[in-house]
Amino acid sequence: SPGERVVTIETAAELRLQHGHVVRLETRPPSIEGTGELGVRDLMINSLRMRPDRIIVGEVRGAEALDLLQAMNAGRDGSMGTIHANSPADALARLEVMALSAGMGLSSRPVREQIAAAIDLVIHIVRLRDGSRRVVHVSEVTGMEGDTIMVSDLFDWYQTHVDSEGFAQGVFRPTGIVPRAIHRIEDIGIYQPP
């Protein structure tokens, strides 16, 4: 909504959000003397003092993953970040490893529980051989089963052919799984056709 405060955290400011209340934070390298560095984790912690409604981290690469998960589990719905991974499940596994690197002495189980509670959707984008980028999976995190974070693909992209100019063509199709969060989706005005 227009009144929401969105805080973006990036190594190099690239996001150009069309929103009225955006606070843009950018990392800073250390000075020649080796002081004054502001990393993503520093900015993540400082952003929480700004009373954000949503936090967007340009790229989650390390211990800031734990801070982002905690923020997401404390009412900052719609927060997001990017992670380089080979699949939605791999992205969640990488997020776990990064959160564990925060040095808080946590074991895997509570971190996985935080991930399962915080993350609703994983959007997987790949770069194809032709250089184009495609969303190939929209997956929902459905909770935990034992020690495993459960993920269900809601949509996937299937390559049908390569056109005469060498570009991959395909179809983005629903898998038939109705999202568990369908009521929350409808509450914000997005309806699934019957």
Residue ranges and their predicted role:
Residues 44:
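Histidine/acidic residue-rich metal-binding segments in metalloenzymes
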Residues 1-7:
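Post-Walker A helix-loop "phosphate-sensing" segment adjacent to the P-loop in P-loop NTPases
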Residues 32, 56-57, 170:
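A generic structural signal for short
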